Amino acid sequence: METPLLLNTLTTLTLLTLLTPIILPPLLNLKNSPMSITKTIKTAFLISLIPTTIFIHSGAESIATHWEWQFIPNFKIPISLKMDMYSMMFFPIALFVTWSILEFATWYMASEPFITKFFTYLLTFLIAMLTLTIANNMFLLFVGWEGVGIMSFLLIGWWQGRAEANTAALQAMIYNRIGDIGLILSMAWLASSLNTWEIQQITHPNQTPTLPLLGLILAATGKSAQFGLHPWLPAAMEGPTPVSALLHSSTMVVAGIFLLIRTHPFLSSNKTALTTCLCLGALSTLFAATCALTQNDIKKIIAFSTSSQLGLMMVTIGLDLPQLAFLHISTHAFFKAMLFLCSGLIIHSLNGEQDIRKMGCLQKTLPMTTSCLTIGNLALMGTPFLAGFYSKDLIIENLNTSYINTWALSLTLLATSFTATYSLRMTLLVQTGHTRTPSNHPINENTPPAILPIMRLALGSIMAGLLISSLILPPKTPPMTMPTITKTAAIIVTTLGIILALELSSLSYSLTPPKHNPLMNFSSSLGYFNPLTHRISPSILLHTGQKIASHLIDMAWYKKMGPEGLANLHLTMTKISTTLHTGLIKSYLGSFALTILTTILLIQK
């Protein structure tokens, strides 16, 4: 059997395996269960390893498959799939991470009344992301894009009785709608100018207009929570912990970056678009890292770290290195999912407590969980030979050796330092010191569905970087020689961040609580972004609307143009007349003299 046909069959089999828990139970009158859905994803993961291995050893660059669905005689829906290094590598990674998260959710969400529905939503969420990944035309990509958006809305607002969860779900939907405007406008431009939505045909090497590219960047900004459209991502942690783990690791938030990776040949011919990505990513990564420094909610710190890493991926797109951005997506998925699962287990053990200031001494009561949390934080920092190092160090090396503006480089290095600071701060407050919140029940991490997924992801956080980086070939020759200071820049700034975190934590035990200053307020208030955008803008719009509705319609239209308008017209004429005819001799003599003077001047001319 030929390689393309074999790959096509096995990839389709993987997708069909995932669809069985959604399609078969209604058809055969069967009952679904969380365990059956988890086993389905495990099976799909094992199947997906076969086409990935075949593709890696085939030496092919990409294999495309095209079908047409004849919906009505004159209307065809193209279904085009692209099996390249990105989609073939992403399939097993996403399935492995989702399998671990769903196994954890069987324990974490055991008391939920609609747990099967919850698992079906998570499965649909994954299928939408895989559709987006394998799509070879903008139509199918848009289907996956919208599917991911709708499922995120349903999952973030899963606990509908909580006002914060409903607000966060609505916020995610609204911010993503803004991004969707950019994608729809870009698709409209492609359809009208190039008459195609096939990705191979739109990525021509000629100079591309900036407008459709800015639409794609706007779409990625909304979906991947870049600066300006970022507030929904930290708010999304109001959903259940398995949702946060899946959302932040391998599904929705990387969809925007994946869109730019897919359309990268279209993007790389326009320097304005690349510079926009670079500067936007640098600003996003620093802003999110700064906000994470003063947060006390464990899930919020991890959420801001996601936003910061997405900014780093956007910087990599701006450097014209899509393979490196994909490598960071792949390695990031393992340790970010693990961090969320560890935080979920800690929160569950401490009666729902999420404030890291109220935790402490957990390395004695939860040794395995805290060890995995430490591994995840070290991988996030870019500690040598863990998963994050292989992508993060390469990104900063390429950043240091590229001809780019120093502003973006400085912001990214500062954000890298801050990453070490907030990661170590979280580790110290959670694990060291004394117990600050006694648990109502004995803390236990011997439950296999709770601890096995975390251990699997910990293994991935250690091994994945080496494994994936050996399979993804760099698009350009990496810089072979560079000054020592350039090579060690990432390690130096990370070490500075660690020293800063240690100093701050040691001072916090001996000094009085610090007074609030503008810098601390800026970080803890999330850069004043939410009050400015979420309160002032709606307030101005509401007041303006009220004025337009009441004053203009009632007063201006009916009164000013009607009876009051007629009265005002006569009043103005009357005032002019009374001003001229005062009955005083001085006024008449003055008017007479002024008239004579004007007449003489006109005659002389």
Curated annotation (Swiss-Prot):
Enzyme class: translocase
NCBIfam families recorded: NDH_I_L
Subunit structure: Core subunit of respiratory chain NADH dehydrogenase (Complex I) which is composed of 45 different subunits.
Single GO biological process annotation from the record: mitochondrial respiratory chain complex I assembly
Keywords: Electron transport, Membrane, Mitochondrion, Mitochondrion inner membrane, NAD, Respiratory chain, Translocase, Transmembrane, Transmembrane helix, Transport, Ubiquinone
Membrane topology: Multi-pass membrane protein
Protein name: NADH-ubiquinone oxidoreductase chain 5
Record's catalysed reaction(s): a ubiquinone + NADH + 5 H(+)(in) = a ubiquinol + NAD(+) + 4 H(+)(out)
UniProt key word Transport: yes
